[in-house]
């Protein structure tokens, strides 16, 4: 009888616990529903120049990575900076009783939901871009342009070229917003010389997580200025930026050569980025694995210096390394530059029969990736999953990394480029939030693979993600000491490890400028505290 009594007691206890759990969850759900209803009502009452969209919001629930989909409560289309500040200040004043968060979205080129927020507010930053770009000090040694944080770099190029000027540092793809690239770093082949884009900013206007509008420079509000640059949107939203300019060339001499040996390829790259006087203006490189017909495709836009030898070059599936160079030209110095280029190339160790050159307009060179985008869109191959992996690898470990990754883990590069090139750490400002390896020279390794939707094979998302994990695991086991660029982690411990010595400063800045963790929740670094009482 005692056993039967105990069994009935356990069942009754379980029933009570289950009932209480259901009641508690129902109360929370009811509370959340009331909160959402209250949030919508209060947001609709905000005096905005622009507007909040509550119905057609699905376009803001995906990004270029095409792997995450978080549906927001609303999308803000700001027509003024005060629209952004008022919205954030309103959420800040609601305190922990609101679970609303805010994500700034430019072109949605994030890879893993970083510009998304579930049941929060996405700010469509391009709504700010109609503000006119202002170019200043055109005839001075230090010209600059003031632009909206939602402005596209391609538009900045078009406008500044009217004055014979252009920004010094770029990204490979120009159809991105200023605020988006400055929140990360902004790297391309000019970075060895000028540093990333975050090293070429004079001033910022920021809306903090409290809804404050602050102007900042290296001297004014310098803590916020340094924190926001490379800060992954955690401390504020960039609404305006002052970008350094330089005289723009008219043409570009564009060069590609091939190597069979990675060590020789890397040695030449390092020699070029350290050369006195910087003999080239742009230096990148990429890895070619299992690609057939490559040189034939180059002949569509490049000219072989030795066409017969180039046509006879056979690599039979071997891994190749392409060094890509550019020298800026003006009509009055073209012959001199061509001679300098010839002399510099003679010092390099590439396969001599694989020298390909062309001359293109400066604008066409900078916007070269957009040409590929147009082609991929026409084939329905642009809006596919992009499980990219971007790494910063210290110089002392790059050969070991190449042997392990390019020699074993990667089997082909037909579904996207693998970019490899070195930069000088001295051109990066260590006071910013951007994280790099400790060595003076480190490499960007960008494995930019596109996945085939629905594929379960080697071109499928899961297989590519498995390969990415293998690369990271190999690097960890080999002690490579790399850092992720455009990082994605899921735990506080991983973020702490990523930031290293900068973690304490990062947390302090978050507490100061966005203490409720309202901003940029898609990075999953900080969790917003919510009270259900």
UniProtKB/Swiss-Prot annotation:
PROSITE patterns noted in UniProt: FAD_PCMH (PS51387)
Annotated residues for binding of FAD: 104, 106-108, 110, 114, 172, 177, 183, 187, 238, 485
EC number: 1.5.99.12
Pros-8alpha-FAD histidine sites (modified residues): 109
Record: glycosylation sites: 215, 290, 424, 430
GO cellular component: extracellular region
First and last residue of the signal peptide: 1-35
Catalytic activity as recorded in UniProt: N(6)-dimethylallyladenine + A + H2O = 3-methyl-2-butenal + adenine + AH2
Tissue: Expressed in the vascular system of roots, of young growing leaves and of the most apical portion of the growing stem. No expression in the root apical meristem. In flowers, restricted to the vascular bundles and transmitting tissue of developing gynoeciae.
Keywords (A to Z) from UniProt: FAD, Flavoprotein, Glycoprotein, Oxidoreductase, Secreted, Signal
Enzyme category, top tier: oxidoreductase
InterPro entries in UniProt: Cytok_DH_C_sf (IPR016170), Cytokinin_DH_FAD/cytokin-bd (IPR015345), FAD-bd_PCMH (IPR016166), FAD-bd_PCMH-like_sf (IPR036318), FAD-bd_PCMH_sub1 (IPR016167), FAD-bd_PCMH_sub2 (IPR016169), FAD-linked_Oxase-like_C (IPR016164), FAD-linked_Oxidoreductases_BP (IPR050432)
Main location: secreted
GO-annotated biological processes: cytokinin metabolic process; stomatal complex morphogenesis
Cofactor: FAD
Stretches assigned to the FAD-binding PCMH-type domain: 68-248
Keyword Glycoprotein applies: yes
Molecular function, one GO term: FAD binding
Keyword presence, Cell inner membrane: no
Subcellular location: Secreted, Extracellular space
Function, in words: Catalyzes the oxidation of cytokinins, a family of N(6)-substituted adenine derivatives that are plant hormones, where the substituent is an isopentenyl group.
Family affiliation: Belongs to the oxygen-dependent FAD-linked oxidoreductase family.
Protein's name in the database: Cytokinin dehydrogenase 6
Species whose genome carries this gene: Arabidopsis thaliana (Mouse-ear cress)
């Amino acid at each position: 009888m005692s056993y039967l009594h105990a069994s009935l007691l356990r069942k009754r206890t379980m029933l009570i616990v289950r009932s209480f759990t259901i009641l508690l969850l129902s109360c929370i759900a009811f509370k959340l529903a009331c909160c959402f209803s209250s949030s919508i009502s209060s947001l609709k009452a905000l005096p905005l120049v622009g507007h909040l969209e509550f119905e057609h919001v699905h376009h803001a629930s995906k990004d270029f990575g095409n792997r995450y989909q978080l549906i927001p409560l609303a999308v803000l289309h700001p027509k003024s900076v005060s629209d952004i500040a008022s919205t954030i200040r309103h959420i800040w004043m609601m305190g922990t009783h609101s679970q609303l968060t805010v994500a700034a979205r430019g072109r949605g080129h994030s890879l893993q939901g970083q510009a998304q927020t579930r049941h929060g507010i996405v700010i469509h930053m391009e709504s700010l871009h109609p503000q006119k770009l202002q170019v200043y000090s055109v005839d001075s040694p230090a010209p600059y342009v003031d632009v909206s944080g939602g402005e596209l770099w391609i538009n900045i190029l078009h406008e500044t070229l009217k004055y014979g000027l252009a920004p010094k540092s770029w990204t490979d793809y120009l159809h991105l917003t200023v605020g988006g690239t400055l929140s990360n770093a902004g790297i391309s082949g000019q970075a060895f010389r000028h540093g990333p884009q975050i090293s070429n900013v004079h001033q910022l206007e920021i809306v903090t997580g409290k809804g404050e509008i602050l102007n900042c420079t290296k001297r004014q509000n310098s803590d916020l200025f340094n924190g926001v640059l490379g800060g992954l949107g955690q401390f504020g939203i960039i609404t305006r930026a002052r970008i350094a300019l330089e005289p723009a060339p008219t043409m570009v001499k564009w060069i590609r050569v091939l190597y069979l040996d990675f060590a020789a390829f890397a040695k030449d790259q390092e020699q070029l980025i350290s050369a006195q006087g910087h003999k080239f203006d742009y230096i990148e490189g990429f890895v070619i694995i299992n690609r057939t017909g490559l040189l034939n495709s180059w002949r569509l836009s490049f000219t072989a210096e030795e066409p017969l030898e180039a046509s006879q070059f056979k690599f039979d599936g071997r891994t190749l390394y392409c060094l890509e160079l550019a020298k800026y030209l003006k009509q009055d110095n073209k012959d001199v530059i061509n001679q300098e280029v010839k002399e510099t190339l003679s010092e390099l160790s590439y396969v001599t029969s694989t020298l390909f050159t062309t001359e293109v307009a400066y604008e066409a060179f900078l916007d070269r990736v957009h040409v590929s985008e147009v082609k991929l869109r026409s084939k329905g191959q642009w809006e596919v999953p992009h499980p990219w992996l971007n790494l910063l690898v210290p110089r002392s470990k790059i050969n070991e990394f190449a042997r392990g990754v390019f020699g074993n883990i990667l089997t082909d590069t037909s579904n996207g480029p693998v970019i490899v090139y070195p930069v000088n750490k001295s051109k990066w400002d260590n006071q910013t939030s951007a994280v790099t390896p400790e060595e003076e020279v480190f490499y960007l390794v960008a494995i930019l693979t596109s996945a085939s939707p629905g594929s379960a094979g080697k071109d499928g998302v899961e297989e590519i993600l498995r390969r990415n994990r293998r690369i990271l695991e190999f690097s960890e086991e080999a002690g490579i000491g790399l850092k992720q660029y455009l990082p994605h982690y899921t735990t506080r411990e991983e973020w702490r490890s990523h930031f290293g010595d900068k973690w304490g400063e990062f947390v302090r800045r978050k507490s100061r400028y966005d203490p409720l963790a309202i901003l940029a929740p898609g990075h999953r670094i900080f969790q917003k505290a919510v009270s259900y009482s």
